[in-house]
């Protein structure tokens, strides 16, 4: 008997990496999960090494980052890999989510798998935000001030909660220490959630481009899909190397190369590029509380997708209307990303408000179209059709 069949630990590795059965028609769009796993390992290793030389003190944080860049052997390489690796991590995540939205991978029986993935997405956004504060540059300080101030919109306890997060009356040394501790801890929680994500995937099985069950037409993960994943790893290494060695600051903000100064406000306060779509949604609502609700709602609306999607057909490739709707949603997401980087002025405010409406309207139309198509295919009634008809007539 093979060693991989006898050792309890190697049995798990064998079940997940070698003998795991996967549908034969998986495309390169199913590479993003493995890319994310490798990227997370790179981020954790580079982050742990950087933490050995970083000083979480407002007077020394910026200087310690410069010390890493100038004095630590290959410190510049570690920092560039960590910073640009975080950007690539979000690129793979957005592509991963987009593929799941297109092919309906959130549908039963993968509801738990999808929910764990959304939790990972929200937690990694929190991890990235507090990590962006650590260099203690100008944009780090003011970004932390603006974003943490959003918590004051919570009724009754908002102001006290902000002071609790700050550890004082402003973003200062206590805040930086708290953020450093959390940024050190959260990646390991992320890794634990990733393991849960893999367990759920192993339990429910992977989706495929057809969106139908393929239990009888499967191949082993190794060597058929490991070779496919290796191609993705090579491309990721090439793309990441281009940014690390030739354009390390391209995805960052130049103001963060200036030490934090509480007395000088930057001309425009913007977060990292991967937060911009949700930052645009936040700014689109004039009310502070309304903006916070809309921003978090844009993330939390991903949880009930399995309930919103009422069509019996899982994949969008066989539904022309939903296919068109999906690509409108993708284009609108890029519009939100573009608007989020622009100053708060017209016409960007109006464009952001329209794009925000389109963002949420996608999920409403997804539900209505699903009901209509289900009725056409099966002649069965849908509760949501009656609900929206009643709601629309009530408004009129």
Curated annotation (Swiss-Prot):
PANTHER family: CYTOCHROME B. The chain crosses the membrane at residues 32-52, 76-98, 113-133, 179-199, 225-245, 289-309, 321-341, 348-368. SUPFAM superfamilies: a domain/subunit of cytochrome bc1 complex (Ubiquinol-cytochrome c reductase), Transmembrane di-heme cytochromes. InterPro entries: Cyt_b/b6_C, Cyt_b/b6_C_sf, Cyt_b/b6_N, Cytb/b6-like_sf, Cytochrome_b, Cytochrome_b_C_euk/bac, Cytochrome_b_N_euk/bac, Di-haem_cyt_TM. Keywords: Electron transport, Heme, Iron, Membrane, Metal-binding, Mitochondrion, Mitochondrion inner membrane, Respiratory chain, Transmembrane, Transmembrane helix, Transport, Ubiquinone. Heme b b566 binds at residues 96, 197. PROSITE patterns: CYTB_CTER, CYTB_NTER. This is Cytochrome b. It comes from Spizellomyces punctatus. It is a multi-pass membrane protein. GO terms for cellular component: mitochondrial inner membrane; respiratory chain complex III. Gene3D superfamilies: Cytochrome Bc1 Complex, Chain C (1.20.810.10). One of its GO terms (molecular function) is metal ion binding. Component of the ubiquinol-cytochrome c reductase complex (complex III or cytochrome b-c1 complex) that is part of the mitochondrial respiratory chain. The b-c1 complex mediates electron transfer from ubiquinol to cytochrome c. Contributes to the generation of a proton gradient across the mitochondrial membrane that is then used for ATP synthesis. Fungal cytochrome b-c1 complex contains 10 subunits; 3 respiratory subunits, 2 core proteins and 5 low-molecular weight proteins. Cytochrome b-c1 complex is a homodimer. Binds 2 heme b groups non-covalently.
């Amino acid at each position: 008997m093979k060693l991989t069949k006898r050792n309890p630990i190697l049995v798990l590795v064998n079940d997940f990496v070698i003998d795991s059965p996967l549908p034969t028609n998986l495309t390169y769009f199913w590479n993003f999960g493995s890319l994310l796993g490798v990227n997370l390992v790179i981020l954790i290793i580079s982050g742990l090494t950087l933490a050995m030389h970083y000083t979480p003190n407002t007077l020394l944080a910026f200087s310690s980052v410069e010390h890493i860049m100038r004095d630590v052997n290959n410190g510049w390489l570690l920092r560039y890999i960590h910073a640009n690796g975080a950007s690539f991590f979000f690129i793979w995540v957005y592509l991963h989510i987009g593929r799941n939205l297109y092919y309906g991978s959130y549908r039963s029986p993968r509801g738990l798998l999808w929910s764990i993935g959304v939790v990972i997405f929200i937690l990694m956004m929190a991890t990235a935000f507090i990590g962006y504060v650590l260099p203690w540059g100008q944009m780090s300080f003011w970004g932390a001030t603006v974003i943490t101030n959003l918590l004051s919109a919570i009724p009754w306890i908002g102001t006290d909660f902000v002071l609790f997060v700050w550890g004082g009356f402003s973003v200062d040394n206590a805040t930086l220490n708290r953020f450093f501790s959390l940024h050190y801890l959260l990646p390991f929680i992320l890794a634990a959630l990733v393991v849960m994500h893999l367990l759920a995937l192993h339990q429910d099985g992977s989706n495929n481009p057809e969106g139908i069950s393929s239990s009888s037409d499967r191949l082993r993960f190794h060597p058929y899909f490991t070779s496919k994943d290796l191609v993705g790893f090579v491309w990721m290494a090439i793309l990441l190397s281009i940014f690390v060695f030739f354009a390390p600051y391209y995805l960052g903000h130049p103001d963060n190369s200036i030490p934090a100064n509480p007395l000088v406000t930057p001309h425009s306060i913007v977060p990292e590029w991967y937060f911009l779509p949700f930052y645009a949604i936040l700014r689109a609502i004039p009310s502070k509380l309304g903006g916070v609700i809309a921003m978090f709602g844009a993330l939390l609306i991903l949880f009930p997708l399995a309930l919103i999607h009422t069509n019996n057909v899982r994949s969008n490739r066989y539904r022309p209307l939903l296919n068109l709707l999906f690509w409108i949603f993708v284009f609108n997401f890029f519009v939100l990303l573009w608007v989020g980087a622009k100053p708060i002025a017209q016409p960007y405010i109006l464009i952001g408000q329209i794009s925000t409406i389109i963002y949420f309207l996608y999920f409403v139309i997804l539900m209505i179209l699903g009901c209509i198509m289900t009725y056409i295919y099966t002649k069965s009634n849908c509760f949501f059709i009656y609900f929206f008809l009643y709601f629309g007539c009530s408004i009129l």
